[in-house]
Amino acid sequence: MKIIRGFAQAEKRLSRRDKAGFFLDETERTELARRLGVDPEKAVNGIIADVRKQGDEAVLGYTLKFDRANLSKLEVGQPEIQQAASEIPAELFEALQLAASQIRAYHRFQKEAVWKTAEIMQGKQLIRPLERVGLYVPGGKAFYPSTVLMTAIPAREAGVKEIILVTPPGANGKIPAPTLAAAQIAGVDRIFACGGAQAVAALAFGTKSIPKVDKICGPGNIFVTLAKKAVFGVVDIDGLQGPSEVLIVADQYANAEYCASDILAQAEHDALASSILITTSEDLANRVNDIVESKADTCSRRDIIKQSLRDNGLIAVVDNINEAIKLANMYAAEHLCLLVKDSEKYLTQINHAGCIFYGEKASVVMGDYVAGPSHALPTSGTARFSSPLNILDFVKYIDIVKVDKQDIAKLGQAAATIAKAEGLECHAEAVLKRLE
C-alpha cells in the first residue's frame, strides 16, 4: 500500500471533489462501452424502454442474454422457497436466524423511537408505512443472503404491506438456497428471478408478473445503479451506491493485526473497494503495511485484493488525532473504524460517516452481518447528506392542518394579504369567505 505523510498530502489524496460520477468509474465505463458498443447509460435507457413496452417478455429476454438463464416464468414458487431452509447447512441457517434477530431488534428499537415522535406530533402529523417496496439483491455467480436480511427486515419492521425481492438467477435458472432461506426468515412476500436494469425497470413500471412498487432499495452493479437513477421520480430509491470503502483512524495503541485484517476484508469485496488507514504512528503504518502485503498472497481472492489495494489503498501518517478526525469527516466514509485509545470520546467529533465502529473488537465484518444496523450504507462521500437504510426509508409522513374559528380569526387576514401580494386573488378570496 502507498504510504503518505502529512495532513496536506492526505487531504489532497482523500478529496472527492473530482468524483462526482462516483458510480461511473471511467475505466469500467470505457470497457463497458467498448463491449456493448454503446455508452452504459444509453444501454440502460434502452433496456428500460424495452421493459416498459414488452413487459415480462423483455425481462425474460434480457435474463437469457445476460444471465444465460432460459426461464418460462419469473416468480419463484412458494414450495421452492419453503424447501430452501432444508437445503442449506444447519449452521448457516442458525447463523442467518441469529443475524435476523439482531437486525430485527435494532430496527424494532428504532421503530419505537419513531412512533414516540409520532405520538408527540399527534394531531399535527400522520406516519404511514409504504404500501409496496422492491428489494434488489445481487446474485448470479454469487449470493448474498445477508443483503436480503439487511434490506427486508427494516422494511418489515416499518410495516410495509408487501415486500418484493428481485435477484439474478444462476445459469440453471435457480436462486441459491441461502438467498431463498434468508428471504423466508425476513418475511419477503414474493421473489422474482431477474436482475440488472431489467429488474429495476420492472419494479418501477410493473409488468404482468412483477407488480409496480413505491420504492426500490438495495445495491447492484453499474447497470443497476444507472437504472435506479433513471427511474427515480417514478419511484423512490434508497440511494446510488458506489464501491464499498473503509477508513480506519488508529493511534499507536491500535492492534496492527486488527487494522490489517479489516483492510484485507474490505479489499476482498472487489477491485474498486477503498481501504484507507489514517494513523498518528509511523511504526503502526509500517507494521500494518507489512502484514497486509504478506497476507494478501495467502487469500483466495488475492488478485482482487491486490488490485484494490494498488488502485484504492492508502496509509496516511498525520501529526495527531484531531487531524485524522478532520480527514475522516472530509472523506465521509461508508465504514469508519476508530481504533484509538478512549475511542468513545471521539464520537461527538464525527459528523460524516455511514456507520462508526469503535472498540478494537468492532470489525466492520460484524456490521456486515450480525451487529444489527443495516449494512446498506451511503458510499462515495454521500454520507455527508444521506443515511444508512433504516425504518425511516420505509415510512412517509402526512401533515395535518385543522383550522377552527379562533385560528381563522388569528391567521386568516395574514394568509389573504400574502396571497394578494403574490397575485392570487382566488387564494385570498377562499380565506376571506371564511372570515365573513
Curated annotation (Swiss-Prot):
Please give the Gene Ontology molecular function terms for this protein.
Answer: histidinol dehydrogenase activity; NAD binding; zinc ion binding
Where is Zn(2+) bound in this sequence? 266, 269, 368, 427
- What remark does the entry make about the cofactor? Binds 1 zinc ion per subunit.
Entry's EC annotation: 1.1.1.23
Name the positions where NAD(+) binds.
Answer: 136, 198, 221
- Name the enzyme's class: oxidoreductase
Q: Which InterPro entries match?
A: Ald_DH/histidinol_DH, Histidinol_DH_CS, Histidinol_DH_monofunct, Hstdl_DH
Q: What name appears for this protein in its UniProt entry?
A: Histidinol dehydrogenase
**Binding sites annotated in the UniProt record for substrate:** 244, 266, 269, 335, 368, 422, 427
Active site, UniProt feature: 334-335
SUPFAM superfamilies, from UniProt?
A: ALDH-like
Q: Which GO terms describe its biological process?
A: L-histidine biosynthetic process
What task does this protein carry out? Catalyzes the sequential NAD-dependent oxidations of L-histidinol to L-histidinaldehyde and then to L-histidine.
Keyword Zinc present in the record's keywords: the answer is: yes
The entry sums up its family as follows: Belongs to the histidinol dehydrogenase family.
Q: Which NCBIfam families match?
A: hisD
Question: In which domain of life is the source organism classified?
Answer: Bacteria
Pathway(s) annotated for this protein in UniProt:
Amino-acid biosynthesis; L-histidine biosynthesis; L-histidine from 5-phospho-alpha-D-ribose 1-diphosphate: step 9/9
Q: Which species does the entry assign this protein to?
A: Dehalococcoides mccartyi (strain CBDB1)
Which reaction does this enzyme catalyse, per its entry?
Answer: L-histidinol + 2 NAD(+) + H2O = L-histidine + 2 NADH + 3 H(+)
- Could you list this entry's UniProt keywords, alphabetically sorted: Amino-acid biosynthesis, Histidine biosynthesis, Metal-binding, NAD, Oxidoreductase, Zinc
Its required cofactor(s), as named, are: Zn(2+)
> Which GO cellular component terms, listed alphabetically, does the Swiss-Prot or TrEMBL entry include?
cytosol
